[in-house]
Regions:
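C-terminal regions of RecA-like/P-loop NTPase motor modules
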Residues: 1-3
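Gram-negative outer-membrane beta-barrel transporters
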Residues: 6-106
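Conserved C-terminal beta-signal and adjacent last beta-strands/turns
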Residues: 64-177
Length: 177
């Protein structure tokens, strides 16, 4: 939606949307010290509202067109090394890597406008590292994480740029049994 040269976002509820897709997942664990896994997702979400809302005769320009602002191909992978009973029985050190890939997709309806000048959420590939030390069989946990360690340009679904490389720390105490 444009108003005086400025772009605004808006929400629209669609009554008939069909989603088809698949998810492939794989996880391999070796001897409690290494695991690797990943997923690949392909989702096709289309507008099946044949007529414009509130009318009975005007056909929708978006009938059977892929819904805007939704990624339809994305994947992630992860790998973790675990050192069980490190220093003390019941403690575990875990070093992990994970990444996320997402193809580029249109911010607005793909059937409207010139393909060369469309607003697109760009393809993204992020990489993260983590280090976690769990003590007393999971009662205490200290974690450090570096998200987007390659400092890639990443965007959310509204094509707003996310923060670059970021570092996080966490200390957790489990008060249950």
């Amino acid at each position: 939606m444009y108003w005086g040269g400025t772009s605004y976002g808006y929400y629209e509820n669609h009554g008939h949307v069909r989603t088809k897709g698949y998810n492939l997942s794989l996880l391999y664990s070796f001897s409690h010290w290494f695991d690797v896994g990943g997923t690949f997702n392909c989702i096709d979400t289309r507008d099946y509202e044949k007529y414009l809302a509130g009318t009975s005769l005007q056909e929708s320009m978006h009938y059977k067109v892929r819904m805007p602002n939704l990624p339809y191909r994305y994947a992630n992978i992860n790998a973790n090394f675990h050192w069980n009973d490190l220093f003390i029985k019941g403690n575990v050190l875990t070093i992990g890597y994970d990444s996320y890939w997402q193809h580029d997709f249109p911010l607005y309806w793909e059937n409207i406008g010139d393909k060369d000048s469309k607003n697109m959420v760009p393809e993204q590939f992020s990489h993260n590292l983590s280090l976690s030390y769990t003590m007393k069989n999971g009662r205490y946990n200290v974690s450090f994480e570096c998200q987007n360690f390659t400092d890639a340009q990443l965007f959310d679904n509204f094509s707003l740029q996310k923060a670059g490389r970021a570092f996080y720390g966490k200390f957790r105490v489990f008060f249950g049994r």
